Swiss-Prot record:
Binding site for Mg(2+) 2: 590, 592
Catalytic activity: ATP-dependent breakage, passage and rejoining of double-stranded DNA
Protein name: DNA gyrase subunit B, chloroplastic/mitochondrial
Enzyme Commission identifier(s): 5.6.2.2
């Protein structure tokens, strides 16, 4: 691969959002090929296949995106493969992968991907083990260190992994749990070492070991310190021990330090401090008695260090999420234990919020796809509030009731359950399936919420008023919602007039560029490949839906155009990716403050209206070049000042060259826009995904909400990240 360019740093407003919230491209884009100066003329042929670019020396890209830039899955060649003649199939063709070889062969089955998300999942596996010790009542402190050599160590003061010989394996227990799949102390029953835990399958520690170039384990227990080294899942030293001094003889705990295998994680080896901090913050909120410290050691001896301890637990979590909102009451919190299952809930309504935030956890594991605990919460909450509404005659019409969406508008709720034998879906544990949990949660919410609201009639009145206003707004928006549904059914016959659609009707290959204004829209329409690229120009800044209710949202023409053009459906309904008209939605705005503002408004709209777009990997940001440098018959494009400087330094001192700075997409010729920003073989895109939904919610509320003081504080806190010389005002 040729020399690489740096990623363009986000402008002032979006920098805050991208740094704290969204995972973007890992690594640097491949340098664009030098183009002849005459290439600004109209291109007649635009092949999509990667063969032409590869023949010219360009890096191979997949589906219009640089493979190594940010894609989580392993890239596969799109070239046609030769047909193979079927041969004899015998026992000799069957492979038996021993020990942890299967993990190394198919790592994505265990950690989700071999990209940034999978890399960070290794940390979470070890961290969750330490938290399990805290949930069992044995650990009070966990230290996580991101070392300068790209290794990570996690140390807890729990009981320490047992070191005696296991009766079945005839190896030490440490080596057993590190080298064998499904070996652990969390399978439940009388022989289990844990009553409640996030680990269930006995594979977390062994998977991390298998995917690490090196791993060191240190155990303190029984007055001794034990050490052993591993490499790619296999022990390379014996378990050694030494007697601790009298001062340290009572020390207990475990430390795991691992170096990820660069042959497995080929796209990135960098651990992000903020990403890991988001997960640690969650765990600290969920475990009030636990203190977790996070430290990052830099090469220049600088150290980032934070400690997380929240004695208030879920109440503090809700307060943190609603920091910048106008709350209607103090957080409501309650706990119930039944049949060995513990339910903790904290919730609060806010007057200036028009969406709900419901976060569910099972044994401190975030269940991003919900589950029976979330279903039970929503059902019981809706039933309880409706009972109060009818009893107080707030709802006078017997045929009208408040839907769950009306009741939850403006609500922030955290529910955490502890289940002795949880039924998770898959190793990544994204959904809880225990049917008995739903029954217990429903009963807990109904009993405790009813009791609280009866004792606090003022809070009840506020919630009913908020819910009733949501119902009225929904009825007012119903006509517009039906219009959206009608337009969606009619599809092409009712698409927005400014939309330049593509010829393809296959959403998988189709992509749409949302551009800023008619000027940029004109260039983009002329420069695109009409076969699979659509263009939707925006008229100025769209509505900030963070501050408006649903009725205002559907009445806004630009918002309607977005909904219909993209096929987003109606807010609140289940997301259906197949209904999307394009599976790649590219935000393409100018590289100035206004462009950053429009980009942020669009991200706010997508996050609040249909967050699943981020989960499905449909949202991208296009990165146009800032400079065009012409020297002789060659033209080079640079994405930031650092890249420009790097390029100019390659020229002789007496070289003659011309630099053109693009302040807007409208300044670029259609062919230039194609060559640099829209051509799948040359362009750079950043795929945006939400790694931490709670953090994302806080950032959007702070940045786009009604509280000016909170927004000002956020900008001031992040001011040190901005280089004033790079501002384009």
């Amino acid at each position: 691969m040729g020399p690489l360019l740096r990623s363009s740093p986000p402008p002032r407003h979006l920098r805050l959002l991208l740094r704290r919230l969204l995972s973007t491209a890992a690594g640097r884009p491949s340098r664009l090929l030098p183009l002849p100066a005459s290439s600004s003329a109209r291109l007649l042929v635009r092949p999509r296949v990667a063969v032409a670019a590869a023949a010219a020396g360009a890096p191979l890209r997949r589906n219009g995106v640089a493979v190594r830039a940010f894609m989580a899955s392993t890239a596969a060649s799109e070239a046609m493969q030769e047909k193979r003649v079927a041969g004899e199939y015998t026992a000799a063709n069957v492979q038996v992968l021993e020990a942890l070889d299967g993990v190394r062969t198919r790592p994505g089955m265990y950690i989700g991907s071999t990209g940034s998300r999978g890399l960070h999942h290794l940390v979470y596996e070890i961290l969750d083990n330490a938290v399990d010790e805290a949930q069992a009542g044995y650990a009070t402190k966990v230290d996580v260190i991101l070392h300068g050599d790209n290794s990570v160590s996690v140390t807890d003061n729990g009981r320490g992994i047992p070191t005696d010989i296991h009766p079945q394996t005839k190896k030490s227990c440490v080596e057993t749990v590190l080298t064998l799949m499904h070996a652990g102390g969390k399978f439940g029953g009388s022989k289990s070492g844990y009553t409640v835990s996030g680990g269930l399958h006995g594979v977390g520690l062994s998977v991390v070991n298998a995917l690490s170039e090196a791993l060191e384990v240190t155990v303190w227990r029984d007055g001794k310190e034990y050490r052993q080294n591993y490499s790619r899942g296999k022990a390379i030293t014996m378990l050694t021990s030494r007697t601790l001094s009298d001062e340290s003889s009572s020390r207990q705990g475990t430390r795991i330090r691992f170096w990820p295998d660069k042959h497995i994680f080929t796209t990135t080896m960098d651990f992000d401090f903020n990403t890991i901090a988001g997960r640690i913050r969650e765990l600290a909120f969920l475990n009030p008695e636990l203190t977790i410290a996070l430290t990052k050691e830099e090469d220049d001896l600088q150290v980032q260090h934070n400690e997380y301890c929240y004695a208030g637990g879920l109440v503090e979590y809700v307060k943190w999420l609603n920091t910048d909102k106008k709350s209607l009451h103090d957080p409501i919190a309650f706990r119930k234990e039944m049949d060995g299952i513990t339910v903790d809930v904290s919730l609060q309504w806010c007057s200036d919020s028009y969406s709900d935030t419901v976060l569910g956890y099972a044994n401190s594991i975030r269940t991003i796809d919900g589950g029976t605990h979330i279903d039970g919460l929503k059902t019981s909450l809706t039933r309880t509030i409706n009972n109060f509404a009818k009893k107080s005659k707030t709802l006078k019409d017997k045929d009208i009731s408040l839907s769950g969406e009306h009741v939850r508008e403006g609500m922030t709720c955290i529910i955490a359950v502890k289940v002795p034998n949880p039924e998770f879906e898959g190793q990544t544990k994204t959904r809880l399936g225990n049917p008995e949990v739903r029954r217990i949660v429903e009963q807990s919410v109904q009993e405790n919420l009813t009791e609280y609201l009866e004792l606090h009639p003022d809070v009840l009145d506020s919630i009913l008023s908020k819910s009733l206003n949501a119902l009225k707004a929904a009825l007012a928006a119903k006509r517009a919602r039906e219009l959206v549904r009608t337009k969606s059914v009619l599809k092409s016959s009712s698409l927005p007039g400014k939309l330049a659609d593509c010829a393809s009707s296959d959403p998988e290959e189709s992509e749409i560029f949302i551009v800023e204004g008619d000027s940029a829209g004109g260039s983009a329409k002329q420069g695109r490949d009409r076969k699979f690229q659509a263009i939707l120009p925006l008229r100025g800044k769209i509505l900030n839906i963070e501050r408006r209710d649903e009725a205002a949202l559907y009445k806004n023409e630009e918002i309607q155009n977005l909904i219909v053009a993209l096929g987003l459906g109606v807010k609140g309904e289940d997301f259906n990716k197949e209904a999307l008209r394009y599976h790649k939605i590219v935000i393409l705005t100018d590289a100035d403050v206004d462009g950053a503002h429009i980009r942020t408004l669009l991200l706010t709209f997508f996050f609040r209206y249909q967050k699943a777009l981020f989960d499905e990997g449909c949202i991208y940001v296009g990165v146009p070049p800032l400079y065009k440098v012409e020297r002789g018959k060659q033209a080079h494009y640079c994405y930031d000042d650092a890249d420009l400087k790097e390029l100019v330094n390659t020229f002789p001192t007496n070289a003659s060259y011309h630099i053109q700075r693009f302040k807007g997409l409208g300044e670029m010729m259609p062919a230039q826009l194609w060559e640099t920003t829209m051509d799948p073989e040359r362009r750079m895109l950043k795929q945006l995904k939400v790694e931490d939904a709670a953090e994302a919610n806080v950032v959007f509320s702070s940045l786009m909400g009604t509280r000016v003081d909170v927004r000002k504080q956020l900008i001031q806190n992040a001011a040190s990240m901005v280089n004033l010389e790079h501002l384009d005002i």
